[in-house]
């Protein structure tokens, strides 16, 4: 498959997976990536483009038992499914009870913290380490353990459901697991993963990775977002933050510091503030907003809580050997107060094995000082 066919058949699904080629390899008049508007007539006509692919769906629905879900008991790790072949995941959707009152089971326990203690893992091509090892809430946009419906280009929470549309290529296989680390709640998951099988994939094409970080911070320590080695690019992140004191938002003073390849001692890219990186300003003075490539689903100043996301396409941060991304507050330590955070960084790398830091304990995952109850009457 040549580069022009790649743009026609795959770019509109998110060309974020394509690792960079040299300028000389680029067809004349064609741009790499996808800025949200067509780069060529082929991009504009993508919905009408006929492609030789086999569409399938991995689902928790069991036709023989007429059961829609797979149970995930507390303390258990369950394989949702494994697929052999070559292709890419085009859409990932799931939902599960436990974080809201269940009208069909009114005495069932409810705890929004299960959005932190239910862990999603994805393995590519027989790799030993998962490329994705992230709490479900953090991965889809509900890392504050509050669910506020929003839809970005690649992920979101939609009125009780959780979806992801990052293109996720695989050459031989993929496997999806869920682990329930909650001390009290059993749950069951509804899941549909639509994937396309193909005899050929465009090259060079990276494997999708999601790195999770979390900590309680006394104030001046850097907020680590991502660190990876090899060739690839950084494609964006979700970041959730909360001050220990109410009305404290000065953690937003920390600009991004991005270290790339030979620029390891001093950052290659430095910003002007944390909210500036997410393309807002003045501590997001107008409150929450939603866009395809950046947004703030939650800003609760009284609770000192902010949920933010940004997606990179044509502005992806490329690297050949390594990358490190952190937010670093320039204020003197005496001006800073404690806060906590959790984050998910999205990358495409030239290897399928995960490189993220090991997941902390369930107790450490529950980093928030306060969880706001967002449950409400919900009877169809």
Task: Give names to the regions the model predicted.
Residues 31-380:
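Beta-strand-centric surfaces of beta-sandwich/beta-rich domains
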């Amino acid at each position: 498959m040549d580069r022009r066919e790649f743009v026609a058949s795959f770019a509109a699904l998110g060309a974020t997976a394509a690792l960079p080629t040299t300028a000389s390899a680029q067809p004349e008049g064609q741009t790499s990536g996808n800025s949200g508007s067509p780069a060529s007539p082929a991009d504009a006509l993508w919905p009408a483009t006929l492609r030789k692919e086999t569409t399938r769906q991995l689902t928790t629905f069991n036709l023989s038992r007429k059961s829609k879900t797979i149970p995930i008991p507390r303390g258990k790790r369950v394989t949702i499914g494994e697929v052999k072949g070559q292709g890419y995941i085009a859409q990932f959707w799931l939902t599960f009870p436990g974080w809201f009152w269940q009208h069909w089971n009114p005495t069932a326990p409810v705890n929004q913290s299960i959005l932190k203690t239910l862990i999603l893992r994805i393995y590519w091509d027989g790799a030993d380490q998962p490329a994705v090892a992230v709490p479900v809430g953090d991965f889809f946009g509900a890392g504050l353990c509050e669910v506020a419906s929003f839809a970005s280009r690649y992920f979101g929470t939609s009125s009780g459901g959780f979806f992801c549309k990052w293109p996720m290529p695989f050459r031989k296989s993929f496997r999806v697991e869920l682990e329930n680390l909650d001390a009290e709640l059993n749950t069951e998951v509804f899941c549909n993963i639509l994937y396309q099988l193909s005899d050929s994939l465009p090259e060079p094409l990276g494997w999708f990775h999601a790195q999770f970080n979390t900590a309680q911070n006394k104030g001046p320590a850097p907020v680590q977002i991502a660190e990876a080695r090899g060739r690839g690019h950084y494609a964006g992140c979700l970041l959730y933050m909360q001050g220990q004191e109410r009305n404290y938002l000065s953690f937003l003073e920390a600009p991004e510091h991005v270290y790339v390849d030979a620029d390891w001692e001093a950052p290659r890219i430095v910003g002007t503030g944390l909210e500036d990186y997410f393309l807002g300003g003045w501590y997001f003075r107008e409150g929450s907003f939603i866009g395809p490539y950046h947004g703030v689903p939650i800003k609760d100043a009284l609770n000192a809580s902010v949920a933010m996301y940004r997606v990179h396409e044509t502005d992806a941060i490329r690297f050949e050997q390594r990358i490190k991304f952190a937010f670093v507050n320039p204020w003197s330590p005496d001006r800073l107060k404690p806060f906590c955070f959790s984050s998910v960084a999205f990358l495409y790398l030239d290897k399928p094995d995960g490189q993220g830091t090991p997941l902390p304990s369930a107790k450490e995952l529950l980093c928030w000082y306060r969880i706001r109850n967002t449950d409400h009457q919900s009877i169809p």
